[in-house]
Amino acid sequence: MIIAGRCICCDGDRLRKSPAVLMPFVAKRVFDWEPVEITPDWGMQTLSPGMAYPLCNSIQCTDCGALFLDMRFDEAEMGRLYSGYRDPTYTAARERFEPGYAARNLMLSERAAYLSEVEAIIGPYLSKPLHVLDWGGDTGLNTPFLHRAESVSVYDISGLAVAEGITAVDRCGLASAPFTLVVCSNVLEHVPSPAALLGDIASVMRPDSLLYLEVPLEAYVAENAGAENLATGKKHWHEHINFFTETALRALVARCGLKIVHLETLETEIYGRLGRQFCLLCARV
């Protein structure tokens, strides 16, 4: 783990920070840390009794508005956090800290209905034959054009088995296949270096390939649009360690040698909850 000293999107150094806590499930999964109660019998001279949780900082870039956790997990830590993502072992561990998670997780076993809206947004820009790579696509259940593309491949660190009809690829296989559409949907909010990830993706894109990016417009950001003090109100961090603004996304994409072909904010129902998603279609410069 390293502590961020620059913006994860625009690479600026004009940052504001405020204390927060790392949620117990993430702390346990990544660092094997447990919450602990400080009691009077500890005999502490300068600490007050009460529950102790892992401390961190919320950081906001004053240039692009990106809001993020200061902790940037390394490859091994990310592996511990996402290995077997949402499988029975993962779900049981998370249920211990977050009662009700297992029930919510059951809903995610079905393909998301809003994907038809995503396909309608990006479909007009695509040409055939369509070969799709879903980068960070889990099992491939929610890959756009799943049943309409000539081929669908998934690259994911979870190690989960992919859905029928999908090919799982490793890093070596990424460079050898002629992908016309690369999808990176609901991934950038999880990763320690969005810029590094986009650089990796750009390296496997052909000159005529398109990249579809999708990230949440988090409610806290949407409800406080334009605010420069978001760090003070963001008191906890879970698996979404990056909160994006449109300005931040534009800066990130440009920094990574990509250009935006289409950008819109989709407001729709996602697994029973109303949500907002940034939807970007990008090409190499």
Label the model's feature ranges.
Residues 205-211:
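Short glycine-dipeptide loop
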Residues 1-185, 194-198, 212, 228-232, ...:
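Conserved N-terminal segment of class I S-adenosyl-L-methionine
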Residues 186, 190, 240:
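Histidine-centered divalent metal-coordination motifs
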Residues 24-35, 213-242, 247-252:
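Short, glycine-/aromatic-enriched active-site segment of Class I SAM-dependent methyltransferases
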Residues 201:
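Class I S-adenosylmethionine-dependent transferase superfamily signal
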